[in-house]
C-alpha cells in the first residue's frame, strides 16, 4: 500500500522520517505539492507536482488514495475525505484520525474559522516537538507493520 503526503505543509523533519522509512521498508511514498520538491534519490520516493490553486493537491490525493493507503496530512477536511474512502489519515504530530475523531476535529476547525472571521486572534499551532516526532514515527511504524502482516 502506498503512502501519500500532503507535502506543501509537511514539516521537513517529518519528510526526513518518511525518506528513511521508504528505503528501510521498501514502500512507495508520493509527495504531492503545488511546487517543485527536492527529495533524495530513491526508487521508493516520488513527487507529484500539481497546478497551483486552492485544494488542488488535496483533490489529487483524494482521487488517488485507495482503501488502506496511508495519507500524511495536517489538513482536517482532506483527512475526512480520505477516511471516507477507507484510507488511513495520520497528521505530522502522530495523531491517527478515525471516523469518530475526525468529526470532532472538523467541528473544532469550523469553530476556530468562525472565531477568526469575527476578528478574534486564535494563534497557530505550537512548533513540532521531539515528542510529536516520536509519536509520528511510532504511528508510521505501526501502519508499516500492519501492511507487512497483510502480505
UniProtKB/Swiss-Prot annotation:
It comes from the Bacteria. Pfam families: DUF188. This is UPF0178 protein PMI1258. InterPro entries: UPF0178. Belongs to the UPF0178 family. The lineage of its organism: Bacteria, Pseudomonadati, Pseudomonadota, Gammaproteobacteria, Enterobacterales.
